[in-house]
Swiss-Prot record:
It holds the Pfam family 7tm_1. Residues 80-90, 152-171, 240-324, 383-481 are cytoplasmic. A lipid is attached at residue 397 (S-palmitoyl cysteine). One of its GO terms (biological process) is cGMP-mediated signaling. Disulfide bonds join 128-207, 350-353. It comes from Homo sapiens (Human). Interacts (via C-terminus) with MPDZ. Changing residue 225 to G/S: Does not affect agonist binding. This is 5-hydroxytryptamine receptor 2B. Changing residue 135 to A: Abolishes agonist binding. Binds lysergic acid diethylamine (LSD) in the orthosteric pocket, but is not the principal LSD receptor in the brain. Bound LSD dissociates extremely slowly, with a residence time of about 46 minutes at 37 degrees Celsius. Ligands are bound in a hydrophobic pocket formed by the transmembrane helices. G-protein coupled receptor for 5-hydroxytryptamine (serotonin). Also functions as a receptor for various ergot alkaloid derivatives and psychoactive substances. Ligand binding causes a conformation change that triggers signaling via guanine nucleotide-binding proteins (G proteins) and modulates the activity of downstream effectors. Its main location: membrane.
Length: 481
């Protein structure tokens, strides 16, 4: 009969680290005293305990792991497939989504296994330091991406012209590479030191960073991976708010402008003849007395151009809304990661504190930090209509964007050059197409001298969007409307 087996015989067939779990411990400690009539009662209690663990595991899978994997996959697909989303800033978001996706794929499931086995490592020993390394790496990379996005946005608002000049795809990839290298540098001490094992029971380990072996890493790693990015995010957030308030004031109090011919060498430069003069485009600038546009149709032109100031105000409003989103991300960042890193520091510095309680709190708070990997794509993308539309199509397995004729007409623009040779500029044709401007619509004012400029031929360039006076220096941002 099954009841005649001795405990020692049963234990010899079970690995040592599995015997330490509550499930086997309850069986082995009560096996000798079990009677046939008491088996259902004992087994019922064990089944209930394991059932509760399974319920918690299912809850974590449904509420945390699956949304993290699904949401970040949608972000990666959107940036990869949508042409409108393929610019430098969104490459940061895609890299952030990659880091968060890897947390959901490789870190969370194994962390869930450790919960099921009551902190005992259920996998081969060699995988323990590798998993801890990936845990620190991907979580740190997620935090570093948030910090980099915050700094990048502040620079784009404070110095728009300079930021646009260095905001290429190659530059974005360099920045992303630096973020990942910093994250690797912070996490690399974990596999180098390795996990200390018990000599008597080498298979009986808990795969956690202990104070005795990783005390210095836990302290300085927390400073580098969290508190330093936190300080940077706080400073850049308030600087961003200040810069937006200043620009909103400048736009609101800007005097009326007049339409003039103005040479702008920083926007369009001919690449065919090095010695040729820069093209001249019609722009808004009341501070210079260049030759004005023909008087014919002035009233119609000014009615059309009066909307440009409104678009400037609208752009400021959009940036303020984006900064509010940044504030939400900043708040969630504090809410989800502060408890873990504060407890981590306390565990190292406080010798009189209950180490068992702090370790238990760490196991809880780390899952709150994991939740941020699922929240990041929601906060950053659900406020963006292009992302929302893409997500809706991807969920229904439709991976092609549809563009209406009305939308295409709204995006078409006509830009008139005073220099007829400007129409042949390879630079302008290349970048015009990239910005949604049809080269077939280019017309030269030299051809239109004998004709009246129609109201439909208005120049849609707003150079007074973000104008700052810093001493004697004036900066103008040129943007397509």
């Amino acid at each position: 009969m099954a009841l005649s087996y001795r405990v020692s015989e049963l234990q010899s067939t079970i690995p040592e680290h599995i015997l330490q779990s509550t499930f086997v411990h309850v069986i082995s400690s009560n096996w000798s005293g079990l009677q046939t009539e008491s088996i259902p009662e004992e087994m019922k209690q064990i089944v209930e305990e394991q059932g509760n663990k399974l319920h918690w595991a299912a809850l974590l899978i449904l509420m945390v792991i699956i949304p993290t994997i699904g949401g970040n996959t949608l972000v990666i697909l959107a940036v990869s497939l949508e042409k409108k989303l393929q610019y430098a800033t969104n490459y940061f978001l895609m890299s952030l989504a990659v880091a968060d996706l890897l947390v959901g794929l490789f870190v969370m499931p194994i962390a869930l296994l450790t919960i099921m086995f009551e902190a005992m490592w259920p996998l081969p020993l060699v995988l323990c330091p590798a998993w801890l390394f990936l845990d620190v790496l991907f979580s740190t990379a997620s935090i570093m991406h948030l910090c980099a996005i915050s700094v990048d946005r502040y620079i784009a608002i404070k110095k728009p012209i300079q930021a646009n000049q260095y905001n290429s795809r190659a530059t974005a990839f360099i920045k992303i590479t630096v973020v990942w290298l910093i994250s690797i540098g912070i996490a690399i001490p974990v596999p180098i030191k390795g996990i200390e094992t018990d000599v008597d029971n080498p298979n009986n380990i808990t795969c956690v960073l202990t104070k005795e072996r990783f005390g210095d890493f836990m302290l300085f790693g927390s400073l580098a991976a969290f508190f330093t990015p936190l300080a940077i995010m706080i400073v850049t957030y308030f600087l961003t708010i200040h810069a937006l308030q200043k620009k909103a004031y400048l736009v609101k109090n800007k005097p009326p402008q007049r339409l003039t011919w103005l040479t702008v060498s920083t926007v369009f430069q001919r690449d065919e003849t090095p010695c040729s003069s820069p093209e001249k485009v019609a722009m808004l600038d009341g501070s210079r007395k260049d030759k004005a546009l023909p008087n014919s149709g002035d009233e119609t032109l000014m009615r059309r151009t009066s909307t440009i100031g409104k678009k400037s105000v609208q752009t400021i409003s959009n940036e303020q809304r984006a900064s509010k989103v940044l504030g939400i991300v900043f708040f969630l960042f504090l809410l989800m990661w502060c408890p873990f890193f504060i407890t981590n520091i306390t565990l190292v510095l406080c010798d009189s504190c209950n180490q068992t309680t702090l370790q238990m709190l760490l196991e809880i708070f780390v899952w709150i930090g994991y939740v941020s990997s699922g929240v990041n794509p929601l906060v950053y993308t659900l406020f963006n209509k292009t992302f929302r539309d893409a997500f809706g199509r991807y969920i229904t397995c439709n991976y092609r964007a549809t563009k209406s004729v009305k939308t295409l007409r709204k995006r078409s623009s006509k830009i008139y050059f005073r220099n007829p040779m400007a129409e042949n500029s390879k630079f302008f044709k290349k970048h015009g197409i990239r910005n949604g401007i049809n080269p077939a619509m280019y017309q030269s004012p030299m051809r239109l001298r004998s004709s009246t400029i129609q109201s439909s031929s208005i120049i849609l360039l707003d150079t007074l969007l973000l104008t700052e006076n810093e001493g004697d220096k004036t900066e103008e941002q040129v943007s397509y409307v």
